[in-house]
Amino acid sequence: MAELVIALDYPTMDAALATARALRGATDTAGDAGGRLWMKVGLELFTASGPEVVARLKDMGFPVFLDLKFHDIPNTVRGAVRSAVATGADMCNIHLPGGERMCRAAVEGLAEGAAARGHGAAPILLGVTVLTSVAPGELPGGADPSAEAARLAVCGREWGLGGVVCSGYEAAGIKQRCGRDFICLTPGIRPAAPQRSGSGDDDQRRVMTPAEAVRAGSDYLVVGRPVTGAAGPDGPAEAARRILAEMRGA
C-alpha cells in the first residue's frame, strides 16, 4: 500500500508542528490503510529550524522525510547524508545529476550514519530525477522529462540508491526497468477537483491525483498545500483522510 507524505513547507517550526499536531487525527486512518503518515521537512523549514524540527516530529510519532536534495562534491555529500541520518530522519535524498561518484559517496554516508545511529530501520536514500515543476520543453536541449527521469533512475539503481523521486508519469516505466522493489516517491499530487485548494496547480506541472499515482505504481505520495492549506482546525486531518481513502480505492 502506498504511503502518504505531508509536505510541511513552512517558514517556522511552530507552524509546522501545529499542522503536524492537527494531523494526528489522520494517523488511525493511515494505519487502517496499511501504511503510515509521513512528514516532509524541506529546505525552507530545515534552514529556519535545524535538526530540532526533525526530533520534534519524531517525538510525535511520525516518520520523517528530510528533503534537502544534496548536490555537491562527493565528500561533502557523503558527510551531509551522514549528518542527515544523525538527525533521526527516516528518508533523505540527493540529486542524481551529481553523478556516479557523488551518489556512491552518498550511499557510503548513509551506511556510516546508520551504523552510528545503531537502532531502528535503515534510512532510505532516494535520488531526485527531474523535478515535477519541470514541464515538457523546459529541459536543456529539449530533452523529454520522462525519458530523462527513466535514464537517471536506472543509473541510481546501479549506483546503490533505494529509489527515486519522480512524477507519477514515470513511475510505471521506472518499475519495469529497475524492479518492483525500487522505490518511487511522487510529488506533484493534487486531489480530484472538489478537494483542491489554493490557486490551480501552483508551481507543479507534471501532476496526478492520488488514485492515478497509486495505479501508476508510486510507493509514496507527497501532498502539501491541499492538506496544509485546508481551512479549519480539523481541515488538514479531514483532507488527509480523503486522500488516504482515494489511495485505498485506487
Swiss-Prot record:
Substrate binds at residues 9, 40, 67-76, 132, 190, 204, 224-225. Its EC number is 4.1.1.23. It is an enzyme of class 4 (lyase). The active site is at 69 (proton donor). It catalyses: orotidine 5'-phosphate + H(+) = UMP + CO2. Pathway: Pyrimidine metabolism; UMP biosynthesis via de novo pathway; UMP from orotate: step 2/2. Transmembrane segments: none annotated. GO terms for cellular component: cytosol. Gene3D superfamilies: Aldolase class I. CDD domains: OMP_decarboxylase_like. It holds the Pfam family OMPdecase. GO terms for biological process: 'de novo' pyrimidine nucleobase biosynthetic process; 'de novo' UMP biosynthetic process. SUPFAM superfamilies: Ribulose-phoshate binding barrel. HAMAP family: OMPdecase_type1_B. Homodimer. This is Orotidine 5'-phosphate decarboxylase.
